[in-house]
């Protein structure tokens, strides 16, 4: 894909998806809010300074590629890294696997609904903030 003509936000989204990151997982790796990643991808703001360098490290590309899409700085194909789970994630997985399958399905459905509600809430808060900032 030709990335030179993409915006900074489009390059961030393109590379994030190539590496199979969600906005939340990228934000977690950068120790920032997922709203910041969303704003970058929409073009509402741009990463600067330390965030730009951290972003280039997580996205396995150069900062100049993020900013300008330079062909000679094209990112290399994604490298599959083994996933290391935190103690909390391991505990969650062990508890989940101890449940009967029907209860696993119920718990997954409930968690999906909670995440959906939180995402909706964050979007509403972001819209309210944008309306306030426009005044």
From Swiss-Prot:
Segments crossing the lipid bilayer: none
Keyword flag Ribosomal protein: no
Keywords: Cell cycle, Cell division, DNA-binding, Repressor, Transcription, Transcription regulation
Task of the protein: This protein is a repressor of division inhibition gene dicB.
GO annotation terms (biological process): cell division; DNA-templated transcription
Gene Ontology terms for molecular function: DNA binding
SUPFAM superfamilies assigned to the protein according to its UniProt record, in alphabetical order: lambda repressor-like DNA-binding domains
Organism of provenance: Escherichia coli (strain K12)
DNA-binding region: 23-42
InterPro entries: Cro/C1-type_HTH, Lambda_DNA-bd_dom_sf
Pfam (any one): HTH_3
NCBIfam families reported for this sequence: PRK09706.1
Domain HTH cro/C1-type span(s) in chain numbering: 12-66
Name this protein carries in UniProt: HTH-type transcriptional regulator DicA
rRNA-binding listed as a keyword: no
Name of encoding gene: dicA
